[in-house]
Amino acid sequence: MIVVEADTDIFRVFNLVQHIFDRYEAWEERLWHILRHGANLPQMLEVSRDILSNPMHLIGSDFRYLAVTDEAYFQKDLGIRLDTETFDAEKMATFLSLHDLSTHVHEPLLLELQGARTLSVNVFDQEEYLGCLTVFEAFRPLRDSDRALAVFLVKLLRQAIQQNPVLASTRSA
């Protein structure tokens, strides 16, 4: 809902709303283009970076990194080593002591992870767990709209993984 509280040029309001619409439409078009031309997961996350405005990573069902944005944030701020194929065993043990893996949950999850809030959306092919997209609250607070945006992105990531199941077993970032 858009509320205009003062006398405003209706054409200016229209142009602002149109600009917002154009931004999301261009994002969707870029995602579909990537999906049709190789389904590159790191590219899909990278073009989504401007929309979600926070670091993200995508892991496969075997917990290997498939794609990551803002690697410096993960390495410097969270101490996560991305040069390995999978999570650090000690950090994973700490996480598991505090949280259930939740690989069965279809709804977006807000979690506290290493002192940062995260929004995670699992990727499913019907009931089969394919992986998880996690958006880290680092550069701006998470918004309610991020849930819908992440769910939309996950639907396209699922299609990319389905196009090439090898993507789910090796990190391609």
Please name every model-derived segment.
Residues 1-173:
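Hydrophobic, helix-rich cores of sensory/ligand-binding and other regulatory modules
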